[in-house]
Swiss-Prot record:
Residues 1-102, 103-169 form the Cystatin domain. Interacts (via the HRR domain) with TPM1; the interaction appears to contribute to the antiangiogenic properties of the HRR domain. Interacts with THBS1 (via the TSP type I repeats); the interaction blocks the antiangiogenic effect of THBS1 with CD36. Interacts with PLG (via its Kringle domains); the interaction tethers PLG to the cell surface and enhances its activation. Interacts with THBS2; the interaction blocks the antiangiogenic effect of THBS2 with CD36. Residues 266-284, 304-322 have a biased composition (Basic residues). GO terms for cellular component: extracellular region. The keyword Transcription regulation does not apply. This is Histidine-rich glycoprotein. N-glycosylated. Proteolytic cleavage produces several HRG fragments which are mostly disulfide-linked and, therefore, not released. On platelet activation, may release a 33 kDa antiangiogenic peptide which encompasses the HRR. Disulfide bonds join C7-C375, C56-C67, C77-C92, C123-C297, C137-C160, C212-C242. It is found in: Secreted. Keywords: Blood coagulation, Copper, Disulfide bond, Fibrinolysis, Glycoprotein, Hemostasis, Heparin-binding, Phosphoprotein, Repeat, Secreted, Zinc. Residues 233-246 have a biased composition (Pro residues).
Length: 396
């Protein structure tokens, strides 16, 4: 039976589980801030944990204990897995919080600066192939004293972490000095900088620094395709590759011929279709990706039904099964002041294939809906300033 257990007591298990999730991630990696809820299903010496975790990302392929943290994006995960250090399934939600922390106007003797945080996306309705991207950006805008024209800042510095299915956390830095007497001419009279993520059409003084993350160890990425998408922020030239195909928590590659570029939104809803204090609805998911990060683009047309695979078992002929990916991470738009990050749904499949390596392992049960009395656990004291973005209690 699935019973509540102590959050602080299972923290080492949660840390190991996040390490497994991070092995399949490119770009943002998760660090444990707190175990928010925990349940345990124990049969003899076999245990399956059901965890709700609050996480903080870092931008490095190193182990997160060795990284310097820059808290701009937070996340929460629900996961289920046995104590033999494998993760059966998980769902996560992430969102940028720096807008709620750092959006401000600073005035000095020589000028006025604005510090903004915003998310960018490519949801073009044009007829060329759509390659969905999503990213979080931080922009610093500087104006002369008492400047009334907000469309022509004297200087703009923008840093973005942009996510694309063919690239891993490509970091973009845009510096745009505006010299005396110089003006930016925006298309259709629109301002040159839009926090909503409008397209940038280039400027002679722009400088771009493109960086691919370090390669994953012991993995062959020689077949990675070049980048070919059009995006709202500048991307690496076509010859630059960031060859990091993601890996699953069980060590398996993504299918090698994944041509899907559609993003999926469960039930056809926008990620913020529900109040931020409620659950985030997650229904069916695309069948042809392992770790698939969902950005806030409009839902695509209905996808064809999932493919079926046929396997031959020893002496049992053919049987059919659905290939299902392990784990989903859903990116939500930036949080505003007073909002909390919605929890993901734990819509894990009601069935589980038998574990031939450990036949005594109990089947994965429905994720517990009630909160454990000895939870949540202790919040990481270094990051108490972002604890307000997490709900302290689960819905009863």
């Amino acid at each position: 039976a699935v019973n509540p257990t102590g959050c602080d007591a299972v923290e080492p298990v949660a840390v190991r589980a996040l390490d497994l999730i991070n092995k399949g991630r490119d770009g943002y990696l998760f660090q444990l801030l707190r175990v928010a809820d925990a349940h345990l299903d124990k049969v003899e010496s076999i245990a399956v944990y059901y965890l709700v975790e609050s996480d903080c990302p870092v931008l490095s392929r190193k182990h997160w204990d060795d990284c310097e943290l820059n808290v701009t994006v937070i996340g929460q995960c629900k996961l289920a897995g046995p104590e033999d250090l494998s993760v059966n399934d998980f769902n996560c939600t992430t969102s940028s919080v720096s807008s709620a922390l750092t959006n401000m106007r600073a005035r000095g003797g020589e000028g006025t600066s604005y510090f903004l945080d915003f998310s960018v996306r490519n949801c073009s309705s044009h007829h060329f192939p759509r390659h969905h991207i999503f990213g979080f950006c931080r922009a610093d805008l500087f104006y002369d004293v008492e400047a009334s024209d907000l469309e022509t800042p004297k200087d703009i510095v923008t840093n973005c972490e942009v996510f694309h299915r063919r690239f891993s956390a490509v970091q973009h830095h845009l510096g745009r000095p505006f010299h005396s007497g110089e003006h930016e001419h925006s298309p259709a009279g629109r301002p040159p900088f839009k926090p909503s993520g409008s397209k940038d059409h280039g400027h002679p003084h722009e400088s771009y620094n493109f960086r691919c993350p370090p390669p994953l160890e012991h993995k062959n990425h020689s077949d990675s395709p070049p980048f070919q998408a059009r995006a709202p922020l500048p991307f690496p030239p076509p010859g630059l590759r960031c060859p990091h195909p993601p890996f699953g928590t069980k060590g398996n590659h993504r299918p090698p011929h994944d041509h899907s570029s559609d993003e999926h939104h469960p039930h056809g809803h926008h990620p913020h279709g529900h109040h931020p204090h409620g659950h985030h609805p997650h229904g069916h998911h695309p069948p042809d990706n392992d770790f698939y990060d969902h950005g806030p683009c409009d839902p695509p047309p209905h996808r064809p039904p999932p493919r079926h695979s046929k396997e031959r078992g020893p002496g049992k002929g053919h049987f059919r099964f659905h290939w299902r990916p392990t784990g989903y991470i859903h990116r939500l738009p930036s949080l505003k002041k007073g909002e909390v990050l919605p929890l993901p749904e734990a819509n894990f499949p009601s069935f589980s294939l038998p574990n031939h390596n450990n036949p005594l392992q109990p089947e994965i049960q429905a994720f517990p809906q009630s909160a454990s009395e000895s939870c949540p656990g202790t919040f990481n004291i270094k990051f108490l300033h972002i604890s307000k973005f997490f709900a302290y209690t689960l819905p009863k």
